[in-house]
From Swiss-Prot:
This is Serum paraoxonase/arylesterase 1. One of its GO terms (cellular component) is spherical high-density lipoprotein particle. The gene is Pon1. Ca(2+) 2 binds at D54, I117, D169. GO terms for molecular function: acyl-L-homoserine-lactone lactonohydrolase activity; aryldialkylphosphatase activity; arylesterase activity; calcium ion binding; phospholipid binding; protein homodimerization activity. Plasma. Associated with HDL. Belongs to the paraoxonase family. Gene3D superfamilies: TolB, C-terminal domain (2.120.10.30).
Amino acid sequence: MAKLLGLTLVGLVLALYKNHRSSYQTRLNAFREVTPVDLPNCTLVKGIEAGAEDLEILPNGLTFFSTGLKYPGIKSFDPSKPGKILLMDLNEKEPAVSELAIMGNTLDMSSFNPHGISTFIDEDNTVYLLVVSHPDSSSTVEVFKFQEEERSLLHLKTITHELLPSINDIAAVGPESFYATNDHYFADPYLRSWEMYLGLSWSNVVYYSPDKVRVVADGFDFANGIGISLDGKYVYIAELLAHKIHVYEKHANWTLTPLKVLSFDTLVDNISVDPVTGDLWVGCHPNGMRIFFYDSENPPGSEVLRIQSILSEDPKVTVVYAENGTVLQGTTVAAVYKGKLLIGTVFHRALCCDL
């Protein structure tokens, strides 16, 4: 009888393991191969060798890159050096990046580990750059003022909160106010790994302001990129491991109401909103297994989607760029400016293409 119970227990454990393993592989799109889609006149951005996980383009063409991310379970080509914020002017004939000096003595630069970024332009044209950072595996939002003439960032404030344990991306709605995605419920790396493997869908979106902090959406399987429509009425949320983008209606009190969901055959990462058309440009991972289990002989590919008329009954989804990893590995973000497409990656290079 004891042997029978033991065998039954082993069988149940193996069955659960098999089911979870199959689900895990499906969520990571483990068996997908990339069908290449090329763009003309693409050049690698000089000076970016350790990733450009997120980027933000200002209306004047100045572009911020967050680079050097160290993230649990993800490859890093420069693990011993702190991250940086880089700047590039897309109006130049041959744009090149330069590191932005960070002014003030309130930020520990040795542990600076930038992830998602977002800008907010005040009524007096002051540019604020909000940066997700992971010092010592924690999560903070660092608030900077961009000093254009000096080509520097003035550190103003560090934001932490118990409802922000594992921030991935942010969408600024004020100098110190934003929506943030938590890609995990837990902050502890061990618990995070089980949360992800079991597909618990406990990640969420938080609205933060100096006066009020609240969870405004939850139930996500790795909430990732977030963006806001040009008219400010809608919030777009990428659910990485469910291969979905959610559209929420934003209300005057900053709460969100679900409106619609789009599904894809790729892992959707950061979302950029076209400043002219309102289209969504999305950096994607066609095969997530190759991101989380890196093999230089079989590297992760890259994919960029353009989503037009997302609020309509029949949105148009176009694969604008796709590549198997020989040029660009692990695309996380894409954004446009005057006929140019910038593509960033989690740990690799960045690419600039003509559209």
